[in-house]
UniProtKB/Swiss-Prot annotation:
SUPFAM superfamilies: Glyceraldehyde-3-phosphate dehydrogenase-like, C-terminal domain, NAD(P)-binding Rossmann-fold domains. NADPH binds at V16, T99, S100, K123, G352. InterPro entries: Asp/hSer_DH_NAD-bd, Bifunc_Aspkin/hSer_DH, HDH_cat, HDH_CS, HDH_short, NAD(P)-bd_dom_sf. Its cofactor is a metal cation. L-homoserine binds at E219, D230. NADP(+) binds at V16, T99, K123, G216, E219, G352. This is Homoserine dehydrogenase. A sodium ion is seen in the structure; a metal ion may subtly affect the relative position of the nucleotide-binding region to influence enzyme activity, and could increase the stability of the enzyme. It comes from the Eukaryota. The active site is at K234 (proton donor). Keywords: Amino-acid biosynthesis, Branched-chain amino acid biosynthesis, Isoleucine biosynthesis, Metal-binding, Methionine biosynthesis, NAD, NADP, Oxidoreductase, Sodium, Threonine biosynthesis. It catalyses: L-homoserine + NADP(+) = L-aspartate 4-semialdehyde + NADPH + H(+); L-homoserine + NAD(+) = L-aspartate 4-semialdehyde + NADH + H(+).
Length: 372
């Protein structure tokens, strides 16, 4: 990659954002980082020259007062301010949004309308209203701006790009099925393993949830994982790419694993304290599957031909690919006309800052190649 300078803005320097900046610092011919924003601060290279660029390897110091001579420091900028700044750069601009902020996601059509390409793991933009989805891609097409969002499903796994390639080359997608949540994968692989480990006693559901929380696999409030909405958003994205006009993640059945009596609790601590009272419910579900020689897993499923999308518990044979998952891995199966009875399967780590950032960085490289 060589030629014209491309100017880069980055929003979000948390888990994924920090890993992305580390990876960016190692890229040969990296774009010129001219905007870096977090919730309370924005740092920019001075206009109109848009130089000096911010060093991604030393991004923390850009927020310090000692660097104020080199950069322009401000409070939090709204999307209009960010779009105005990047659109006036002396070359093509790219915005990397490493947040899950719906306000930023809603502004994607604005950025694209100003010729700013977008790379992001932000699921909100692509799984909220279908109107926003259409607006994003219609605006991109009319302005020659680019949109890449590999890491919205499966972190760094090539899920989105593979499905887009299948569709673009004319394959007919019949069904998509998989374990889309690293958290729920870990919970069920631990709670109901396909093969019992010798010397390891079976754990109660509440114990497995507590262990996952301690290991950092769950959100601070595990209900944000157990309600199934994260999986529903990912399934919405894939269903839309496959050609279904899914209106929102609330427009199809999503099975919540939160006991009805615990849904209204105000604190995560109280939820964790009372969860053991409902262990018998999950035990019964596990035992029912075992009585039929099967295991239970939490999956997302898109029946493209039948136009049916659903998320929830499902039983699988113990020798199935889904039953063989380990740890917090994801697995996504694409059933298509070309691949016949044996689906195209993508499997691997579906969560984690470094692998999610890898998907973002790889998308950025693709955008840079196309813009150059």
């Amino acid at each position: 990659m060589s030629g014209k300078t491309i100017y880069l803005g980055v929003i979000g320097v948390g888990g994924v954002g920090a890993h992305f900046l580390t990876q960016l610092s190692r890229l040969p011919n990296a774009p010129s980082l001219v905007l870096l924003a977090r919730s309370s601060q924005t740092v920019t290279s001075p206009a109109p020259s848009y130089s000096p660029a911010i060093a991604p390897s030393d991004w923390q110091s850009a927020f310090s007062t000692s660097s104020s001579a080199s950069y322009t420091q401000s409070g939090a900028w709204n999307p209009d301010q960010i779009a105005a700044y990047l659109s006036k750069a002396p070359g093509r601009a790219v915005l990397v949004d490493n947040t899950s902020d719906p306000t930023v996601a809603d502004a994607y059509p604005l950025f694209l309308s100003k010729g700013i390409s977008i790379v992001t793991p932000n699921k909100k933009a692509f799984s909220s209203s279908f109107n926003l989805w259409k607006n994003i891609f219609n605006t991109a097409a009319s302005t020659s701006s680019l949109v890449y969002h590999e890491s919205t499903v499966g972190a760094g796994l090539p899920v989105v790009s593979t499905l887009r390639d299948l569709v673009a080359t004319g394959d007919r997608i019949t069904r998509i099925e998989g374990v889309f949540s690293g958290t729920l994968s870990f919970l069920f692989n631990s709670f109901a393993p396909a093969t019992a480990q010798s010397g390891v006693s079976a754990q109660k559901w509440s114990q497995v949830v507590a262990q996952a929380k301690d290991l950092g696999y769950t959100e601070p409030d595990p209900r944000d994982d157990l309600n199934g909405m994260d999986v529903a958003r990912k399934v919405t994205i894939l269903a839309r790419i496959a050609g279904l006009e899914v209106q929102s993640p609330e427009s199809f059945p999503v099975e919540s694993l939160i006991p009805a009596k615990l849904r209204g609790l105000t604190s995560a601590a109280e939820f964790m304290q009372r969860l053991p009272d409902f262990d018998d419910q999950m035990e019964a579900i596990k035992n029912q599957a075992e009585a039929e020689g099967k295991i239970v897993r939490y999956v997302g499923r898109v029946d493209v031909e039948g136009k049916v999308v659903k998320v929830g518990l499902q039983q699988f044979d113990k020798d199935s690919a889904i039953a063989g998952l380990k740890g917090s891995d994801n697995i996504i199966s694409f059933y298509t006309e070309r691949y016949g009875k044996n689906p195209l399967i993508i499997q691997g780590a579906g969560a984690g800052g470094a692998v999610t950032a890898m998907g973002v960085t790889a998308d950025l490289i693709k955008v840079l190649e196309r813009l150059h």
